[in-house]
Amino acid sequence: MTDTLVAEKAATAGGVIHLGDVTKVFGKEGVAGSYRAVDHLNLDVASGQMLALLGKTGCGKSTIFNMIAGLTEPTAGTVRVNGKNPFAEFDAFRGKIAIVFQGDRLLPWRTAIQNVQLGLEMLDRPPPDRKDTARKWLIKLGLGGHEDDYPHQLSGGMRQRVSIARAFATNAHLLLCDEPFSALDESTAGKLRGEFVRLVKENGKTAVFITHSISEALEIGDRIVVLKRPAMIAYDVSFDKDTSLEERMMIRERIGEVLAA
């Protein structure tokens, strides 16, 4: 079996995300305290793809995430989202990239529906449209009847549902997810993962999902990229709903070997 067992690397020029020969160094390289987080990384993500970035702590997942989000720029190389530089043209991506964090990051003085409306307010959507859109997504996430609850009145899983609703409500095409279910119990996380994948596919979104869990990567991704420090691709595999259980087990085994090496 090869590393492209199920499919060729599903990343081509013209995709939503392009990272070309990207290097990121924190501090001045060669000087004490400097750190090379990403090393000559090449990665493309196709439209509609659900990419799971998998790796141990410190392998550069969050640095890649932040470069795609336009929160930091590479030391060298090219980062493009829909053909544009997300760092240099940050304002052009308002409403086009949505982020779901590990914590829900809800404003405690706002109700659930007001928290979902926050992104829409920043996009200057008219108030009636904001409220209707926020309500629609809360209902889709199973929170109908909780629109006027404050975060402290909601469980951890419910709060994360609000944060996911907030991301979808902006109608952003690209969703960036930084271990959004890691703080939840497995039963709650499992249900949310399934709903999240369904909504991404139903609404034609592209998603990049950071995780350190092989099981979560296999459950969420239709492509998994395994990173080894400093953020080099050690394994890249794509699969789909027709991939057999035997093939998935072999992929799991191979990922385990790569991470242990």
Map each language-model feature to its residues:
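The feature captures the beta-strand-to-loop junction immediately N-terminal to the Walker
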Residues: 54-56
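Helix-to-loop junction immediately C-terminal to a conserved catalytic motif
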Residues: 69
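Conserved ABC ATPase signature
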Residues: 150-154, 158
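Hydrophobic anchor residue at the start of the ABC signature
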Residues: 164
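Catalytic Walker B motif of ABC-type/P-loop ATPase nucleotide-binding domains
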Residues: 175-178
